[in-house]
Amino acid sequence: MKCGRKRRRRRRHACKRKKRACKQRSSTIVRAHLVHRRRAARRCP
């Protein structure tokens, strides 16, 4: 049921704190998010 949601949330909050880093990382976060979703789709019912 929990498909690694906690990690995603943590990243988002950290991003809010460091707004400068957010712009640089945004593209990588999106990529990682998509990759993780594909992996999680196999595990989760």
Curated annotation (Swiss-Prot):
DNA-binding recorded as keyword: yes
A GO cellular-component term linked to this record: nucleosome
GO terms classed as biological process: cell differentiation; chromosome condensation; spermatogenesis
Transmembrane segments: none
Tissue/organ expression: Testis.
Compositionally skewed regions (Basic residues) per UniProt: 1-23
Keyword list, A-Z: Chromosome, Developmental protein, Differentiation, DNA condensation, DNA-binding, Nucleosome core, Nucleus, Spermatogenesis
MF terms (GO), sorted A to Z: DNA binding
Region (Disordered): 1-26
UniProt protein name: Protamine Z2
Source organism: Scyliorhinus canicula
Lineage: Eukaryota, Metazoa, Chordata, Craniata, Vertebrata
